[in-house]
Curated annotation (Swiss-Prot):
SS bonds (residue pairs): none
Keyword Chloroplast: no
Taxonomic superkingdom: Eukaryota
Alphabetical list of PANTHER family matching this protein: ARMADILLO REPEAT-CONTAINING PROTEIN 4 ARMC4, OUTER DYNEIN ARM-DOCKING COMPLEX SUBUNIT 2
Gene Ontology, cellular component aspect: outer dynein arm docking complex
Coiled coil residues, start to end: none
Ranges of biased composition (kind: Basic and acidic residues): 317-338, 379-401
Tissue distribution: Expressed in trachea multiciliated cells.
The protein's role, per its UniProt record: Component of the outer dynein arm-docking complex (ODA-DC) that mediates outer dynein arms (ODA) binding onto the doublet microtubule. Involved in mediating assembly of both ODAs and their axonemal docking complex onto ciliary microtubules.
ARM repeats: 484-523, 525-564, 535-577, 622-661, 663-702, 746-785, 828-867, 871-910, 912-951, 953-992, 1004-1031
Any one of the GO BP annotations: outer dynein arm assembly
Region (Disordered): 317-409, 423-446
Name the record gives this protein: Outer dynein arm-docking complex subunit 2
Length: 1044
């Protein structure tokens, strides 16, 4: 057994904790075989089953002490077996959660008791006891250190010869049985492995490339995006590091489905599975497997994404109905790639012929690898173009065509850049590079004349003198460097290396010319990565110390372009770039240039603007935010915020907006009085500046003091007025977000009501993107806490669009809309509308949502719906399976879900018929299991639920039998008065049963309740007094019975 567990079983990599068994079919098969061996051991080898282990097998169990019956002594949270060794020590000892077992007989009985949990228990035992043979038989029988074969048997025979007694003979028999099990497990593993699916790099690559063709933002696409985590491809077709290729891993891909978070997937020879994703520190992949192994990528995605599965079936139908739609000789209608038409058409026809149904079995024909670099728009560019076409043509995907104009190439470049910025998330250092495949021009392509002209200029840069170099740089600058052909021409002939080398010369003119070109071409995502790979960023960081302001400006602007992805931002920080960029914000004090006032001031402003621009790009990672703060960036940004230069204000506010996501920054922003200037710039005519100011307020308004400052400085009125301009969706999302967060304060809600913002918000509930809807509904949810605002929303017809949004899939939107609907349901008139629109059923269906936040919010919303419905009992019973669903939610691990569900059950149980139904569904034992909690919110609602459930049948007695009374008494020691009131009411109801009274008295309830009789809360007084009265009556009755 030791060798099989060491060599065949698949263990997780040694991280911060102990190794665990991976969740693989092979491991499951091994564990099941071990279970079968142990379960049958007691019957096949009854004498050996009584053998006492040298050391107990010990692990953390999930078994409940109550599961043990005859043959065991159960006392509270401990269990002892009646069967003991010669010293009287029990062979099984459980002290929750630790369990110790010292014989095969007890192991076999434990598995019988575990029932459905036996697999988990066996796995936990194996993980906690990596060398079980040594513990069972002693170190002399340690199979792990022995070689399988005759040497093992001979060693055992030697031991028996030396120790000629019955115990040694039993040990020998057990050792041989374990050796046979070991060999059986090894053979079983080999058979299992031989049946597993084996993928190869070509299969995986073609599947990913074909999926890319059907990816994008359109409704008909199967995925939003799918990208490799690494551009580098080894000669064997793998992209995984060599030390992972040894384990059979081929590559790693980031997949973004339409209806789920981004998935980090490992493609290996054994199959495809989810890994641990990107780590927070260095952005490396956590290679540990998190889930099942699937035969291919399509199968995994069908399991994880309903939209993928649905759209894949549509693609199958589409291609089966129109097999002849795309012919190689079709005339190109739209420009997509910068390359020769004949070359691309030929390649495209090959792709069209090879395009097949991804949902079927593995591809039968694979693309042959090529040594030629090709120039083509990357898969990401194609996705971006497809998304643009979806927006223009109502969601219909247009086919890509063969060539592209310079303007079209620039559009693609900007779109790709925007996607990359979105992926480079602003909230955390764990954002990941969206690395793209490295595309180069094909040698024999018919390229524009500019391509060859630029390559000639690069040759002059390489071999010319200083004068020739400057002339070549000036000539190169005259080309349209925004055109991708020109950018790639510079790179393909080695021009990037030359330009970066020029930055290390002493000639200022050469540096300026080189930086001007690098600044233009670094808008291209591939060029950015090439610059980082060639070590260009450290050189630019050093230039920031130059006394020449023009050089500093160009270097900072180029850094701003390059630092759009995580690796580049990390390089800037590690080479001291953040400190130097912060210094640029204050560069005027250290200037040594001629004091020509207007020119001097203009140059200073430009240097500070470029520095702020670079900091804005760098501030998208947490570590850089901290570096900016420690370098003293906040006071300098605050000072620049007072300037009148709009081109300066945008990057300054943008940097503050990114940084304001961190609590330390929000405190510093308050201290520097930045809110006042943010509010002031809301009145600017520049829409981009308004957007960033609103977004910064949105980030900062989590703090109550900041919300008050926004109101005091007059920021609510411009925010309300900006709601009327709905053309700019990005700005509208920022403004509605700021209004949402500001609405958390009641004083601000009153102001918004004065400015008629609530009516405007109701009007935004339709025909808006989800980013706007989340904020609009969030703001209405806060406003709905007041009666006047609920009336306004109802009169403006806001109930119906709110209820309509309950059918969405966006988690944040569902959380907000359920809160808003629940708040509206407090009004009887609104509740009638919600009921008529089937809103309660929609809320109830959200209890099945996989996201705990959505479940909890939906449950809270149901409470006022049940309270204010005309015939609540009948309404609840009308939902088929609804009561059982609510009761089963009591098995959740999320405290908020549990508290909200308890609140729902409290309202459901007001109807006696419904109370009877949920009692039949087992609500009493489930509530009793939750009693041992320290969460005051859950305690309060749990106590209220128990109080209400006591009013049916023998539920009072059942709560006592399930040991719910003693934990409730401890609730009285809480500091929360609401918990005291609910607990006293529950104890009062429970005290109607004599056994419960005894339990309360034993746990010291009387003294605690006596203190609460003097509470100013009348309900608490009454419940406490009633409970004491019941306990006292029981005591008197016992006393009377004793003397009579």
């Amino acid at each position: 057994m030791g060798v099989a567990l060491t060599r065949s079983a698949q263990w997780t990599a040694a991280g911060h904790g102990a190794k665990t068994l991976e969740v693989t079919p092979l491991n499951e098969a091994i564990v099941k075989e071990i279970i079968m061996f142990v379960e049958s051991f007691i019957y096949k080898y009854p004498q050996e089953a009584n053998y006492v282990f040298v050391e107990p097998l010990e692990w953390k169990t999930n078994l409940d002490p109550s599961a043990f019956g005859s043959g065991y002594a159960v006392s509270g949270t401990t269990v002892k077996s009646e069967e003991a060794d010669k010293n009287g020590e029990p062979l099984l000892y459980l002290s929750v959660p630790q369990i110790k077992i010292r014989s095969f007989g007890q192991l076999s009985r434990m598995l019988y008791i575990a029932k459905n949990m036996k697999l988990k228990e066996a796995q936990a035992c194996i993980e906690a006891n990596r060398n079980p043979v040594a513990k069972i038989l002693g170190l002399d029988y340690n199979i792990i250190s022995e070689k399988i074969g005759n040497s093992f048997v001979s060693n055992i025979l030697d031991k028996i010869t030396k120790d000629d007694d019955s115990e040694s003979e039993i040990k020998m028999k057990i050792a041989l049985q374990l050796k046979q099990l070991d060999l059986h497990l090894l053979n079983h593993s080999l058979k299992h492995i031989s049946l597993e699916i084996r993928l190869n790099p070509g299969t995986v690559k073609n599947d990913i490339e074909l999926l890319k063709q059907f990816s994008g933002k359109g409704k008909q696409t199967v995925l939003e995006s799918i990208e490799y985590t690494s551009d580098y491809e080894f000669s064997n077709g793998c992209r995984a590091p060599p030390w992972r290729q040894i384990k059979g891993e081929i590559c790693y891909v980031l997949v973004k489905p339409h209806d789920a978070e981004t998935l980090c997937v490992t493609c290996s020879k054994e199959g495809v599975f989810l890994n641990g994703g990107k780590t927070d520190d260095e952005g490396q992949i956590n290679y540990e497997r998190k889930g099942e192994i699937y035969k291919d990528l399509v199968t995994l995605l069908k399991e994880k994404s309903a939209i993928f599965s649905e759209n894949m079936s549509k693609q199958e139908i589409k291609f089966s109905e129109q097999p002849q739609k795309d012919q190689p000789n079709e005339a190109p209608k739209e420009e997509v790639a910068i390359t020769h038409k004949a070359s691309v058409t030929s390649r495209k026809s090959t792709q069209e012929k090879n395009r097949i149904n991804l949902g079927r079995s593995q591809l039968t024909k694979r693309l042959e690898p090529s040594l030629n670099w090709r120039t083509s728009v990357s898969s990401k560019d194609r996705n971006t173009l497809r998304d643009t076409q979806v927006e223009k043509h109502g969601g219909k995907l247009e086919k890509s065509r063969s060539s592209v104009s310079p303007g079209r190439a620039q559009l693609i470049r900007k779109s790709v850049e925007k996607i990359e910025e979105i992926i480079s998330d602003s909230s955390s250092e764990s954002e990941e590079d969206e690395e793209q495949p490295d595309h180069r021009q094909e040698a024999n392509a018919d390229l524009p004349s500019e391509y060859w002209q630029i390559q000639k200029l690069v040759k002059y840069l390489k071999g010319g003198n200083q004068t020739a170099t400057v002339i070549a740089l000036c000539s190169m600058k005259d080309f349209n460097l925004a055109q991708e052909t020109c950018q790639l021409a510079i790179r393909d002939v080695g021009g990037l290396e030359v330009l970066i080398n020029l930055l290390e010369t002493d000639e200022v003119k050469c540096k300026i010319g080189s930086l001007k070109i690098l600044k233009e071409i670094s808008h291209n995502p591939q060029i950015r990565r090439n610059i980082v790979d060639l070590g260009g960023l450290p050189v630019m960081v050093n230039i920031l110390d130059s006394p020449h302001k023009s050089l500093k400006c160009l270097a900072a602007e180029t850094i701003a372009n390059v630092a759009k992805f995580r690796r580049a931002r990390r390089v800037v920080r590690r080479h001291g770039g953040i400190t130097k960029l912060v210094a640029l914000l204050d560069c005027g004090k250290h200037s040594g240039e001629p004091a020509q006032s207007s020119l001097y001031e203009t140059r200073d402003v430009e240097v500070a603007r470029c520095g702020a621009l670079a900091l804005w790009s760098c501030s998208k990672s947490y570590a850089n935010k901290e570096a900016i703060r420690k370098a003293g960036g906040i006071p300098l940004l605050a000072r620049l915020l007072k300037t009148s230069h709009e081109n300066m204000l945008i990057p300054v506010v943008g940097t503050l907006q990114e940084c304001a996501s961190e609590e330390n920054y929000r405190a510093a922003i308050k201290a520097e009085r930045i809110i006042e200037n943010l509010v002031k710039n809301l009145n600017s005519e520049n829409e981009q500046l308004q957007e960033h100011c609103a977004m910064a307020i949105y980030q900062c308004a989590e703090d109550e003091e900041t919300r008050d400052l926004v109101r005091l400085h007059g920021g609510l009125k411009p925010l309300a007025s900006l709601l009327n301009n709905t053309d700019n969706k990005e700005r509208l999302a920022a403004v509605t977000g700021a209004i949402w967060k500001c609405s958390i304060s009641k004083e601000n809600v009153t102001k918004f009501r004065e400015y008629k913002a609530i009516e405007t918000l109701v009007g935004l509930l339709t025909d808006q993107p989800e980013e706007v809807l989340v904020n609009v509904v969030g703001a209405l949810g806060e406003c709905c806490q007041e009666h006047e605002n609920r009336v306004i929303i109802r009169r403006c017809g806001g109930i119906q669009p709110l209820v309509n949004l309950l059918v969405g899939i966006n988690q944040a939107l569902l959380v907000n809309v359920t809160k808003a609907v629940g708040a509206c349901a407090v009004e009887p008139e609104s509740m009638m509308i919600i009921d008529r629109l089937d809103g309660v059923r929609l809320l109830w269906s959200l209890l099945k949502n996989p996201h705990p936040d959505v479940k909890a919010s939906a449950a809270w919303a149901l409470c006022p719906c049940i309270q204010n419905a005309k015939d609540a009992g009948e309404m609840v019973r009308s939902f088929v399976g609804g009561l059982e669903l609510v009761v089963n939610l009591l098995k959740s691990d999320n405290k908020e879900v549990l508290a909200s569900v308890c609140a729902v059950i409290t309202n459901i149980a007001k109807d006696q018929e419904n109370l009877a139904v949920i009692t039949d569904h087992g609500v009493v034992p489930l509530l009793s299991k939750l009693a041992n909690t320290n969460n005051d919110k859950l305690r309060r609602h749990l106590a209220e639920t128990i109080s209400r459930c006591c009013m049916w049948g023998r539920n009072r007695v059942a709560f006592g039998e399930h040991k719910a009374v003693a934990p409730l008494v401890r609730y009285l020691k809480s500091n929360d008065t609401n918990v005291h009131r609910a607990t006293a009411q529950a104890l009062y109801q429970l005290s109607e049963d004599a056994d419960n009274c005894v339990t309360m008295h034993e746990n010291g309830a009387v003294k605690l309740l006596l203190d609460m009789v003097g509470s100013p809360d009348e309900e608490l007084q009454e419940a406490a007094a009633g409970c004491i009265s019941n306990i006292r009556r029981l005591a008197l009755a016992i006393e009377k019975a004793r003397y009579s």
